[in-house]
């Protein structure tokens, strides 16, 4: 739609098509009915729920260490807006090139879900979190050392697969900590902290890009990803193993 020569018409048609496809997907959700949970906690006020948070974190140290590690690793997302800008400076971007790079990013993320899902079923989401973080680190480093057209396509495929595995595992692993009744609170805590970190990251990335260049953004993002992954590796045990140990059986 955009073609070799970028134009307002090409971009407009792209946005309209994206709007139509997104609307179709959202409308299809109207037919989905939420299943009835086996147990439901007694309804309490928001203030009462907030007062329970410190006790929840104290009683589940593994989860507490996890969401801190996740927040640190999420800071690594600061590089996401700058990958395409760096690629534009290094190889130049036409509509066709942008389409190919976006296609590699999207398709790698889509197909990798099958691989990440198989790994999660067999070994748990913790391993997916670690592997996807390391893949993200490798892809970012490759973009720095070999900014050619072919390598850029490969790098964006790696980033697409890594980001998809990271997002899926970082959210899904929360479901495996602790008891079922406090699961919504754990999800809220982990997502809130991660989104705060995800919001701060691009601001820091923008400042680094302005003062020191895009390379500094990627190096800093790699640092956060490595630190987050190391914290999970050394201080967050596999939740399934913890649950099996607490119940006296192996799942």
Q: What do the PLM-derived regions correspond to, one by one?
A:
Residues 34-68, 249-251:
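Juxtamembrane intracellular "pre-TM" segments in multi-pass secondary transporters
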Residues 111-124, 209:
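Helix-to-loop junctions at the C-terminal end of transmembrane segments
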Residues 165-179:
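Intracellular juxtamembrane helix-capping segments at the cytosolic ends
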């Amino acid at each position: 739609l955009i073609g070799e020569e970028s134009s307002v018409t090409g971009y407009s048609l792209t946005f309209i098509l994206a709007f139509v496809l997104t609307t179709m997907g959202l409308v299809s959700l109207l037919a989905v009915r939420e299943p009835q949970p086996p147990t439901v906690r007694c309804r309490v006020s928001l203030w009462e729920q907030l007062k329970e948070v410190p006790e929840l974190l104290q009683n589940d140290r593994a989860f507490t260490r996890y969401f801190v590690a996740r927040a640190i690793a999420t800071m690594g997302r600061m590089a996401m807006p700058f990958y395409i800008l760096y690629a534009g400076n290094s190889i130049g971007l036409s509509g066709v090139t942008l389409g190919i790079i976006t296609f590699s990013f999207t398709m790698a993320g889509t197909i990798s879900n099958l691989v990440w899902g198989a790994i999660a079923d067999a070994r748990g989401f913790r391993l997916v979190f670690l592997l996807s973080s390391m893949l993200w680190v490798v892809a970012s480093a490759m973009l720095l050392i070999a900014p050619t057209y072919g390598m850029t396509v490969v790098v964006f495929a790696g980033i697409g697969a890594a980001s998809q595995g990271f997002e899926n595992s970082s959210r899904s692993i929360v479901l495996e900590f602790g008891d079922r009744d406090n699961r919504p609170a754990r999800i809220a805590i982990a997502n809130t902290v991660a989104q705060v970190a995800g919001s701060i990251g691009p601001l820091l990335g923008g400042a680094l890009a302005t003062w020191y260049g895009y390379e500094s953004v990627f190096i800093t993002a790699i640092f956060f990803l490595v630190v987050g992954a190391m914290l999970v590796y050394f201080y967050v045990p596999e939740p399934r193993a913890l649950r099996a140990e607490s119940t006296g059986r192996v799942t």
